[in-house]
Amino acid sequence: WSYQISPMAGGTQSTATIYSNEDLGAEKVRLVFRRHTEWGQSVFLYGSEPGLSCAKNCRVSMTFDDNKPITLDGSIPPTGEPAIFIEEDKKFIAQVEKAKSVAIEVTVKGKPSSTLHFDVGGYDATRFQPLPQK
Protein backbone atom coordinates (compact mmCIF):
# COMPACT_ATOMS: atom_id res chain seq x y z
CA TRP A 1 0.00 0.00 0.00
CA SER A 2 1.07 3.53 -0.75
CA TYR A 3 -0.42 6.44 1.24
CA GLN A 4 -0.38 10.09 0.26
CA ILE A 5 -1.86 13.40 1.42
CA SER A 6 -1.73 16.30 -1.03
CA PRO A 7 -3.55 19.45 -2.13
CA MET A 8 -5.89 18.80 -5.06
CA ALA A 9 -8.58 20.80 -6.89
CA GLY A 10 -9.66 23.19 -4.17
CA GLY A 11 -9.13 20.86 -1.25
CA THR A 12 -6.93 18.23 0.34
CA GLN A 13 -6.86 14.63 -0.80
CA SER A 14 -5.83 11.55 1.16
CA THR A 15 -5.25 8.34 -0.80
CA ALA A 16 -4.40 4.71 -0.13
CA THR A 17 -3.34 2.85 -3.28
CA ILE A 18 -2.28 -0.67 -4.20
CA TYR A 19 -1.53 -2.27 -7.59
CA SER A 20 -3.05 -5.47 -8.97
CA ASN A 21 -0.89 -8.58 -9.12
CA GLU A 22 -1.62 -8.92 -12.86
CA ASP A 23 -1.11 -6.62 -15.81
CA LEU A 24 -4.30 -5.68 -17.61
CA GLY A 25 -3.38 -4.41 -21.02
CA ALA A 26 -0.22 -2.33 -20.81
CA GLU A 27 0.04 -2.07 -17.03
CA LYS A 28 -1.25 -3.04 -13.63
CA VAL A 29 -4.53 -1.59 -12.35
CA ARG A 30 -4.60 0.53 -9.19
CA LEU A 31 -7.13 0.08 -6.43
CA VAL A 32 -7.56 3.55 -4.93
CA PHE A 33 -9.23 4.70 -1.72
CA ARG A 34 -9.66 8.48 -1.86
CA ARG A 35 -10.94 11.05 0.62
CA HIS A 36 -11.21 14.61 -0.63
CA THR A 37 -12.36 17.55 1.49
CA GLU A 38 -14.86 18.65 -1.19
CA TRP A 39 -15.72 15.41 -3.06
CA GLY A 40 -15.97 13.04 -0.08
CA GLN A 41 -14.84 9.42 -0.01
CA SER A 42 -14.59 7.12 -3.00
CA VAL A 43 -13.13 3.76 -4.00
CA PHE A 44 -12.18 3.01 -7.58
CA LEU A 45 -10.10 0.90 -9.93
CA TYR A 46 -7.91 2.95 -12.25
CA GLY A 47 -6.43 1.36 -15.37
CA SER A 48 -5.00 2.47 -18.67
CA GLU A 49 -6.62 3.17 -22.03
CA PRO A 50 -8.81 1.89 -23.61
CA GLY A 51 -10.26 1.67 -20.13
CA LEU A 52 -12.45 -0.55 -18.02
CA SER A 53 -15.93 -1.33 -19.24
CA CYS A 54 -19.06 -0.92 -17.17
CA ALA A 55 -22.51 0.37 -17.98
CA LYS A 56 -23.24 3.81 -16.53
CA ASN A 57 -24.43 1.87 -13.50
CA CYS A 58 -23.26 -1.72 -13.14
CA ARG A 59 -22.59 -4.47 -10.63
CA VAL A 60 -19.01 -5.46 -9.81
CA SER A 61 -18.35 -9.02 -8.63
CA MET A 62 -15.57 -9.63 -6.10
CA THR A 63 -14.32 -12.27 -3.69
CA PHE A 64 -12.57 -11.47 -0.40
CA ASP A 65 -10.18 -14.22 0.69
CA ASP A 66 -11.96 -17.59 0.29
CA ASN A 67 -15.44 -16.25 1.04
CA LYS A 68 -18.44 -16.38 -1.27
CA PRO A 69 -18.41 -13.75 -4.04
CA ILE A 70 -20.33 -10.54 -3.45
CA THR A 71 -21.55 -7.95 -5.92
CA LEU A 72 -21.43 -4.20 -5.26
CA ASP A 73 -22.74 -1.24 -7.25
CA GLY A 74 -20.26 0.30 -9.67
CA SER A 75 -20.14 3.14 -12.18
CA ILE A 76 -17.83 4.74 -14.70
CA PRO A 77 -16.86 8.39 -14.35
CA PRO A 78 -18.68 10.79 -16.68
CA THR A 79 -15.33 12.47 -17.40
CA GLY A 80 -14.03 9.46 -19.36
CA GLU A 81 -11.11 8.31 -17.20
CA PRO A 82 -10.25 4.58 -17.48
CA ALA A 83 -11.81 3.81 -14.09
CA ILE A 84 -14.66 2.02 -12.34
CA PHE A 85 -15.99 3.43 -9.08
CA ILE A 86 -17.20 1.05 -6.36
CA GLU A 87 -20.24 3.02 -5.20
CA GLU A 88 -20.61 1.08 -1.95
CA ASP A 89 -17.25 2.42 -0.72
CA LYS A 90 -17.87 2.02 3.02
CA LYS A 91 -18.89 -1.62 2.60
CA PHE A 92 -15.87 -2.32 0.37
CA ILE A 93 -13.38 -0.70 2.78
CA ALA A 94 -14.90 -2.60 5.73
CA GLN A 95 -14.32 -5.87 3.84
CA VAL A 96 -10.72 -4.91 2.96
CA GLU A 97 -9.98 -4.20 6.63
CA LYS A 98 -10.74 -7.87 7.42
CA ALA A 99 -9.19 -9.47 4.31
CA LYS A 100 -5.81 -10.59 3.02
CA SER A 101 -6.83 -10.53 -0.64
CA VAL A 102 -9.60 -9.49 -2.99
CA ALA A 103 -10.29 -10.77 -6.51
CA ILE A 104 -12.33 -8.36 -8.66
CA GLU A 105 -13.89 -9.22 -12.02
CA VAL A 106 -13.40 -6.52 -14.64
CA THR A 107 -13.83 -6.08 -18.37
CA VAL A 108 -11.53 -4.01 -20.56
CA LYS A 109 -13.39 -2.32 -23.41
CA GLY A 110 -13.55 -4.75 -26.33
CA LYS A 111 -12.13 -7.75 -24.42
CA PRO A 112 -13.50 -10.65 -22.36
CA SER A 113 -13.73 -10.29 -18.58
CA SER A 114 -10.70 -10.98 -16.38
CA THR A 115 -10.03 -11.24 -12.68
CA LEU A 116 -7.65 -8.87 -10.91
CA HIS A 117 -6.10 -9.91 -7.61
CA PHE A 118 -5.00 -7.44 -4.95
CA ASP A 119 -3.03 -8.41 -1.82
CA VAL A 120 -4.81 -6.06 0.58
CA GLY A 121 -3.65 -7.63 3.87
CA GLY A 122 -1.27 -4.80 4.76
CA TYR A 123 -3.92 -2.05 4.62
CA ASP A 124 -3.42 0.42 7.49
CA ALA A 125 -6.60 2.41 8.11
CA THR A 126 -4.72 4.84 10.40
CA ARG A 127 -2.68 6.08 7.41
CA PHE A 128 -5.80 6.87 5.33
CA GLN A 129 -6.60 10.32 6.72
CA PRO A 130 -10.25 10.88 7.75
CA LEU A 131 -12.24 13.73 6.27
CA PRO A 132 -12.63 16.82 8.46
CA GLN A 133 -16.02 17.29 10.10
CA LYS A 134 -18.18 19.91 8.38
Task: Describe every region a protein language model picked out.
Residues 1-134:
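A generic "folded-domain core" signal
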